């Protein structure tokens, strides 16, 4: 199993983010397969943000963006190669906003993960799979733009035979297997880390404002795993208490 996800999910892949029904859909996956982006919980859903499109981009908003990313402290430490060094708030921000990252996929207010289909494991199908394992230290990171940014959508009625780069300093609302994700391009130039939250053993969130609080949280990992139903409840709680960007889309 990939070390990126070793402490993030169970031993087997537990979610299936939808089959590729058409060759064009396969091309769309390929269009982003080599992009550089910070790994997060969205990796569970096989979400690879695209950096190219064959559709005309249509401007729909110009506004400030607030979005969320779920991951684990282990995931960040492993990707940064920190070894025994302490993970700091600055390191977390640098990981997500590394200038080498071409795109950052964000969860927004109208991101609905209830449509995700659990993958069968053997002959059994567990509808309440583990999202964050016992012993892990999951965190929720809230990002916001420094200033207003153009938000686009793809005009599916205006298609080209060739893919073109989406470009920098913009955001694109995209749908991956029924999940609305907001991709921010060249995030290091437009985004900043606003807040970090940890998960308590009562499936609640606590704000981690200092490196001391972050270190204390990492020394008290989850005593019980967070399963799908609990995670969906946490996500709804986040949406109610944190003003994430809402971008209505038509199915």
Curated annotation (Swiss-Prot):
Pfam families per the UniProt record, alphabetical: Pox_VP8_L4R
InterPro entries in alphabetical order: VP8_pox_nuc-bd
An example Gene Ontology molecular-function term: structural molecule activity
Site (Cleavage): 18-19, 32-33
Keyword annotations of the record: Host cytoplasm, Late protein, Virion
Signal among keywords: no
Protein's cellular compartments: Virion; Host cytoplasm
Superkingdom, taxonomy of origin: Viruses
Function of the molecule: Major core structural protein.
Family, similarity comment: Belongs to the orthopoxvirus OPG098 family.
Name by which UniProt lists this protein: Core protein VP8
Originating organism: Monkeypox virus
């Amino acid at each position: 199993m990939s070390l990126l996800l070793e402490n993030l999910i169970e031993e087997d892949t537990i979610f299936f983010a939808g089959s590729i029904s058409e060759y064009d859909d396969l091309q769309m996956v390929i269009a982003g397969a080599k992009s550089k982006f910070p790994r997060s919980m969205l990796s569970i859903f096989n979400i690879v943000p695209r950096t190219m499109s064959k559709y005309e981009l249509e401007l729909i908003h110009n506004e400030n963006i607030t979005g969320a990313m779920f991951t684990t402290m282990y995931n960040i430490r492993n990707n940064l190669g920190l070894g025994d060094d302490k993970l700091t708030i600055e390191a977390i921000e640098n990981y997500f906003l590394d200038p080498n990252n071409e795109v950052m996929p964000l969860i927004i207010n109208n991101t609905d993960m209830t449509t995700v289909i659990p993958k069968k494991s053997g002959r059994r199908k567990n509808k309440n799979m583990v999202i964050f394992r016992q012993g892990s230290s999951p965190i929720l990171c809230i990002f916001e733009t420094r200033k207003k940014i153009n938000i686009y959508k793809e005009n599916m009625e205006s298609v080209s035979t060739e893919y073109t780069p989406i470009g920098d300093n913009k955001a694109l609302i995209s749908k991956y297997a029924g999940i609305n994700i907001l991709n921010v391009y060249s995030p290091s130039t437009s985004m900043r880390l606003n807040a970090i939250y940890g998960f308590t053993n009562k499936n609640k969130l606590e704000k981690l404002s200092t490196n001391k609080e972050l270190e204390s949280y990492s020394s008290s990992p989850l005593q019980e795993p967070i399963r799908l139903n609990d995670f969906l409840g946490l996500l709804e709680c986040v949406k109610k208490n944190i003003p994430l960007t809402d971008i209505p889309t038509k199915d």
